[in-house]
Amino acid sequence: MKILIPTAKEMNTDLPSIEATPLKPESQAVLDALALYSASQLESFYKVSAEKATEEFQNIQALKRQTAQHYPALKLFDGLMYRNIKRDKLTEAEQDYLENHVFITSALYGVVPALSPMAPHRLDFLMKLKVAGKTLKSHWKAVYDEALKKEEVIFSLLSSEFETVFSKEIRAKMVTFKFMEDRGGQLKIHSTISKKARGAFLTALIENQVQTVGEARRLNFAGFVYREDLSQPQGLVFVKEV
């Protein structure tokens, strides 16, 4: 069983660095394509300020020169979902579960264990980078599929932009999750609720060592409970009354 989570734009580098591992050929090809952009070209590519583009240019060039600082990916990313994941003071069993079951899907690194070394970078599958004439999704599809082909159960906490990198055969094995708030009988869903809830849900999976869909259905976390009436066999819905 594997649990898939996306990367995040926000990062925290105020951490002890760890040793880098060599880039896969597929990752190196993406990096080589990114490294062709000047700082001013990155400004329009990323749709960011000149200052931010310069920072990203320096990150890319540091990776290219193999001088970039690397950090455990789960701790480097610091978006709303990540800030709601239990990342410190894990028991030995929780640490083992995290290492064996939780994987991050990255447009630069591929599908990798959550504590893999990553350097600060900005890239997702909505960005129009061409790698040897292919889109990022086409470039990664075979590698993404290979990472999961032996899995019977895949818990996806990904957005559709990441899920669609995988083939239909792999996506057919995915269990997806939706998190909603019940405000006086009105069911609400928005990105802030979803991101926080994904982090809290992953924490509950880790703490309870969940291995099956049945075990996931029984979880109560951060006020969320499973709603069978709203769910599908491979699309679980959790609702929090507020």
Curated annotation (Swiss-Prot):
GO terms of biological process kind: response to hydroperoxide
Disulfide bonds: none
A Pfam entry, by short name: H2O2_YaaD
GO cellular component: cytosol
Signal peptide range in chain numbering: none
Database matches in NCBIfam families: PRK02101.1-4 (NF002543)
Family assignment from sequence similarity: Belongs to the UPF0246 family.
Entry protein name: UPF0246 protein SPCG_1533
Species annotation: Streptococcus pneumoniae (strain CGSP14)
Lineage: Bacteria, Bacillati, Bacillota, Bacilli, Lactobacillales
